[in-house]
Amino acid sequence: MKDIYQMAAEFRTTILKARTNREFSGDGLIERFPSGNCGVACDLLGRYLLEQAGVRSWYTSGVIGSESHVWLTLENGDIVDITGDQYKNQSGSLYYDLPVYVGRMDAFHSKFRLNSNPVEITPNDWTPDFLGEDRMQRKKRIAYETILKYIG
C-alpha cells in the first residue's frame, strides 16, 4: 500500500493535470485549485484515502484573522494538507509554500484557531439520501470521478 504522503501528492498532481486539461473549467468548484479550494480538496482527498486505503480522516478548519484554511486530521493525529501553498504569496506568519504536507501539527497550521470540531469524512458525505443527489454532491462526484480518471 502507498503511504499517505505518496497518495496525497499523487492526488494533488492529478488535480493539477486535470485542471491543465481544463477538466474543471466553469465547474465553480475546483477550477482555481489550490487557491480557495482547501475545503473541497479535503472532502475529495478524504474520500480517496478512505476508499483506497481505509484511512479515516477528519475535516479540520481554522481561522486566523480574516483568513480561513482547511486540512485533514488523521486518526494518529497527523495532518494532511494539499493546498497550503495557496499562501505562498503571503508575507509574515501566513507565508507557507509546501504544496503537500503530511505530519504533525506544524508552526503554520497551529496559527489557525479551530472554528469548529473536526468532522469525520464518511460515505454519508457522498451518498445521496432518499431525496437524491444534491447539487453540491453532484459537483463533487463529477470532480472526484474526473480525478480518478487521471490517477495511474
Residue ranges and their predicted role:
Residues 1-152:
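A structural boundary/capping signal
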